[in-house]
């Protein structure tokens, strides 16, 4: 698995925190100092923390587990969708719906409704309706796409959350904590790291920084999935070898 280097993080501006007057004292140990009233994050902490989180992600993916990518603020939304799609993982990149995890039964009903509308739009059902009815159903489908389109194939609760900006996504983190779902989170100098199992101290606003985190997590997912596929091949080969040995033994008898 490829690891992220300090050079990668420096180029992306991961070390630039928030203005010193907005800091959260709980992030004290991750702060190197200040420059022009901006806190500087100590990347000596960020590099091992990020790579530790990536190993955790890779191990989960190898077991075919699901990592839910969460980033609903404007700077993160597009990147989160692209990287989650690339890794074949679920995502939430618009508004987090309260109860998305803790009330998943209700969310599942919405997913079912969304799938029904998708089917109807493709099988000719919409062609039999009035323009007004089609317009209303399309609006409903668009609304569902924005809110749950990224989790329609999740198939149940995720096994971990990967979160950009833990303060902005506090509701998601609280729901995950309540259910015992591990949280991997990018935590800036103004944020509260409580409730985050894998704290990645770093800038959570710069698009280049968000791209580095999301790409690294997606790459780790793909690495884990490819390892799982490789192990599956080995298992098949071992079984085939055992079958051949049994066949040879039977013939010799």
Curated annotation (Swiss-Prot):
It holds the Pfam family Ribosomal_S2. Transmembrane segments: none annotated. PROSITE patterns: RIBOSOMAL_S2_1, RIBOSOMAL_S2_2. One of its GO terms (biological process) is translation. Keywords: Ribonucleoprotein, Ribosomal protein. GO terms for cellular component: cytosolic small ribosomal subunit. InterPro entries: Ribosomal_uS2, Ribosomal_uS2_bac/mit/plastid, Ribosomal_uS2_CS, Ribosomal_uS2_flav_dom_sf. One of its GO terms (molecular function) is structural constituent of ribosome. Belongs to the universal ribosomal protein uS2 family. PANTHER family: 30S RIBOSOMAL PROTEIN S2 PROKARYOTIC AND ORGANELLAR, SMALL RIBOSOMAL SUBUNIT PROTEIN US2M. This is Small ribosomal subunit protein uS2. The lineage of its organism: Bacteria, Pseudomonadati, Pseudomonadota, Gammaproteobacteria, Oceanospirillales.
